[in-house]
């Protein structure tokens, strides 16, 4: 079963988070493609059963490039019926990551995707709407590496749910 992770990244932090999600997906047995928005493999995404989309928070919103991609390209990839998910990175604690995730999930719902949240049902760590990582550039006590497990666990759970829904491994 194929799953895709699509992201925008300004400093490399969101790219790292995307790779961690893909690592978790692969641990769950999924074939995973990781794509920056400028280089999405459309054929792979069309075949994927699940797609997770991520963006850094910029002024408490997704990046302008991600918003443009969602409006121009995202809906043309046959997203309806797929399992969808979202993640974010931010430079500050409470830097808008939740808003970014909610905006991405709203786009996914408009496309007809089934949106994933393991919430509290999967136990700890509890990841309600999607993982958020804070980098250490501004807040030295926060290092993106501290959030790695949230991203890999989310990827593993996401791929397992996609396999359960679509009956594939």
Question: Over which residues does each language-model region extend?
Answer:
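Hydrophobic anchor at the start of a short beta-strand
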Residues: 3, 32-33, 115
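Generic secondary-structure signature for well-ordered alpha-helical cores
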Residues: 26, 71, 75, 109, ...
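A short, well-structured beta->alpha microelement
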Residues: 30-40
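Glycine-rich phosphate/pyrophosphate-binding loop and the adjoining helix
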Residues: 118-169
């Amino acid at each position: 079963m194929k799953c895709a992770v699509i992201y925008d990244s300004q400093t490399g932090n969101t790219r790292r988070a995307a790779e961690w999600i893909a690592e978790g997906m692969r641990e769950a047995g999924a074939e995973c493609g990781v794509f920056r928005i400028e280089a999405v493999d459309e054929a792979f995404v069309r075949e994927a059963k699940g797609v997770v989309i991520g963006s850094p928070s910029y002024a408490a919103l997704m990046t302008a490039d991600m918003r443009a991609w969602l409006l121009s390209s995202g809906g043309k990839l046959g997203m309806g019926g797929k399992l969808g998910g979202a993640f974010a990175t931010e430079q500050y604690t409470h830097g808008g990551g939740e808003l970014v995730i909610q905006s991405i999930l709203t786009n996914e719902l408009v496309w007809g995707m089934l949106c994933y949240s393991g919430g509290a049902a999967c136990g700890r760590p509890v990841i309600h709407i999607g993982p958020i990582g804070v980098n250490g550039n501004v807040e030295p006590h926060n290092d993106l590496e501290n959030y790695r497990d949230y991203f890999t666990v989310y990827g593993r759970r996401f791929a397992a749910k996609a396999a359960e829904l679509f009956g594939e491994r």
